Curated annotation (Swiss-Prot):
GO terms under cellular component: cytoplasm
Subcellular location: Cytoplasm
Lineage: Bacteria, Bacillati, Bacillota, Bacilli, Lactobacillales
Active site: 335 (proton acceptor), 359 (proton acceptor)
Catalytic reaction annotation: L-fucose = L-fuculose
InterPro entries per UniProt: Fuc/Ara_isomerase_C, Fuc_iso_dom3_sf, Fuc_isomerase_C, Fucose_iso_dom1_sf, Fucose_iso_N1, Fucose_isomerase, Fucose_isomerase_dom2_sf, Fucose_isomerase_N/cen_sf
This protein's name: L-fucose isomerase
Record Pfam families: Fucose_iso_C, Fucose_iso_N1, Fucose_iso_N2
Cofactor: Mn(2+)
Metabolic or biological pathway, per its Swiss-Prot or TrEMBL entry: Carbohydrate degradation; L-fucose degradation; L-lactaldehyde and glycerone phosphate from L-fucose: step 1/3
S-S bridge residues: none
Enzyme nomenclature, EC number: 5.3.1.25
Length: 588
């Protein structure tokens, strides 16, 4: 059984015996326990289990104790460390020198002992040795007897832990390409060096004929297939067929296509993570899967010109339920856009929520909306908005039909209930695919995302000579008047899932206007997650050494390793590029 990645907590202490160290043992170890309790009681793994922490076997005052802690962490699948101390310690003697995992240090802000002095000293050693570390120092002085973790310290500890866990969850997993390059899209030209060096992942690949092989040879669970057919007939609403009359399939042909796309879903899932049921059926090799944390399906055009498209498969892999019940989502990219798949993966690992994959299709200015519909935009939409619409697939969680405190949300699967599942299904239909584009047919997904949800749109791009760069745009989904929505939606493809998105403007750079956001977006796709998580993404990017070229996160929320400030404090964007370039990828 594969262990969850864990956070290692390192209580460091003044090594002087005969009174000094002894007086600090309890306080120092209690700091470590408090941090472990905070993380385990607040954060969860994608499977819903509490995040696990490992505390060093003793306080760390000298090198042998640092070495003992290091050995324990190696055996315990520790993916990141947090060092805590209320006092002076011996900097380079007590630091963790593992170069391939993130590190953070919390120095207690008190007057009795110089925790802040150790923090500064050990961070200087980290910078000198080229091993980045995040510095955490409370804004307010605390009493030595105060065991509470201040709110500003909590925020940084949790931000660090979320991002660090994401690095650990990605390590030693795979990206699975089902097919190859789709329609010349750059993101589907999969770059194995990026995955290996920045994410610690490997690349797997299967030809799309693997789907037809498994169908023809019965390499799927026939009992599950029958159960799925019953569920689909009961719960899935087939939408309006908008095809030309000569392209409309007969009822019998559509029935066959439903069977086909259900099998596609089952096979796509089994390819990613395996299925022990296949071994029982005599298919031991296929039963193991590809250990894929994220995958993509080429589809267009070689597959979709002949077979039903991947929309149903992609939709339900990214959704948190199917005929087997509520479960965690998969991360699955349309058109094998691996870079958007990774963007979705970053979002997912930071939030444990499903992801919207969308084309960044159209910028609608207030003037254009007024001209076309007669409607004057107000509120969040007053400066215009972006039409996010994928060509046929999207997680059903993207409907916004789940709620928390009466507001629409996208939330982890363990919070989802059956009434919310039914609401998602009732607010979605599955029209036959547009056969001018998808000659082989299939069924697209059609819904409208509810408005007033805080969301973050993300995109990873590869820049020759630089490497990966990340873009982040926080904003809100919009709910337009029904007639305005239909007028605008019908100008594209009303059989596809739509999200209206207004990024939050800052008045400068790429966020001077909504037009500038669209104009500076690096690719045709974006990954959209629930919540404003730009600060977490910036922290994660710094751990992976990926510079952020565009974001609208307030400066006070940016949390990067301390040595980033040594690359400059006035122009943080340029300092980020220089730090990432000098340090190089996390796993190189």
């Amino acid at each position: 059984m594969i262990q969850h990645p864990r956070i290692g907590i390192r209580p460091t202490i003044d090594g002087r015996r005969q009174g000094v160290r002894e007086s600090l043992e309890v306080q120092t170890m209690n700091m470590a326990k408090s941090v472990a309790d905070l993380i385990s009681s607040t954060l969860k793994y994608p499977d819903g289990e509490p995040v696990e922490c490992v505390i060093s076997p003793s306080t760390i005052g000298r090198v042998p104790e640092a070495a003992a802690s290091h050995e324990l962490f190696k055996k315990s699948n520790v993916c990141a460390t947090i060092t805590v101390t209320p006092c002076w310690c011996y900097g380079s003697e007590t630091m963790d020198m593992s170069p391939d995992i993130p590190h953070a240090i919390w120095g207690f802000n008190g007057t009795e002992r110089p925790g802040a002095v150790y923090l500064a000293a050990v961070l200087a050693s980290h910078a000198q040795k080229g091993i980045p570390a995040f510095g955490i120092y409370g804004r307010d002085v605390q009493e030595a007897s105060d065991t509470a973790i201040p709110e500003d310290v909590k925020e940084k500890l949790l931000r660090y832990a979320r991002a660090a866990l994401a690095t650990g969850l990605m390590r030693d997993t795979a990206y699975l390409s089902m097919g190859s390059v789709s329609m010349g899209i750059g993101g589907s030209i999969v770059n194995p060096d990026f995955f290996q060096e920045y994410l610690g992942m490997r690349n797997e690949s299967v030809d799309m004929t693997e789907f037809t092989r498994r169908m023809d040879r019965g390499i799927y669970d026939p009992e599950e297939f029958e159960r799925a057919m019953v569920w689909v007939k009961e719960h899935i609403k087939e939408g309006v067929d908008r095809n030309r009359e000569d392209l409309i399939l007969s009822k019998e042909e559509k029935e066959k296509q439903w069977e086909f796309v259900i099998k596609m879903f089952m096979i796509g899932r089994d390819l990613m993570v395996g299925n022990p049921r296949l071994a029982e059926l005599g298919f031991e090799e296929e039963a193991v899967g590809h250990h894929a944390l994220v995958a993509g399906f080429q589809g267009q055009r070689q597959w979709t010109d002949h077979f039903p498209n991947g929309d149903f498969m992609e939709t339900f892999l990214n959704t948190q339920f199917d005929w087997n019940g509520i479960r965690k989502p998969f991360v699955f990219a349309t058109e094998n856009d691996s870079l958007n798949g990774v963007s979705m993966l970053f979002n997912y690992l930071l939030t444990n929520t499903p992801q919207i994959f969308a084309d960044v299709r159209t910028y609608w200015s207030p003037e254009a909306v007024k001209r076309v519909t007669g409607h004057t935009l107000e509120g969040c939409a007053a400066a215009g908005f972006l039409h996010l619409i994928n060509s046929g697939s999207c997680t059903l969680d993207g409907t916004g039909q789940a709620t928390r405190d009466g507001k629409p949300v996208m939330k982890p699967f363990w919070e989802l209930d059956e009434s919310e599942v039914q609401a998602m299904l009732e607010n979605t239909d599955f029209p036959p695919a547009n056969r001018e584009y998808f000659r082989g047919g299939g069924f697209s997904t059609r819904f409208l995302t509810k408005g007033d949800m805080p969301v973050t749109m993300v995109r990873l791009n590869l820049l020759k000579g630089v490497g990966p760069v990340l873009q982040i745009a926080e904003g809100y989904t919009l709910e337009l008047p029904e007639d305005v929505h239909h007028t605008l939606d019908n100008r594209t493809d009303p059989g596809w899932p739509t999200t209206w998105f207004a990024p939050r403007l800052t008045g400068k750079g790429a966020f001077k206007s909504v037009y500038d956001v669209m104009n500076n977006w690096g690719a045709n796709h974006g990954a959209i997650t629930y919540g404003h998580i730009g600060a977490d993404l910036i922290t994660l990017a710094s751990m992976l050494r990926i510079p952020v070229n565009m974001h609208n996160v307030p400066e006070e929320d940016i949390f990067r390793p301390k040595n980033w400030s040594l690359f400059g404090t006035e122009d943080l964007e340029s300092a980020d590029y220089r730090a990432c370039q000098l340090l190089g990828p996390l796993h190189k």
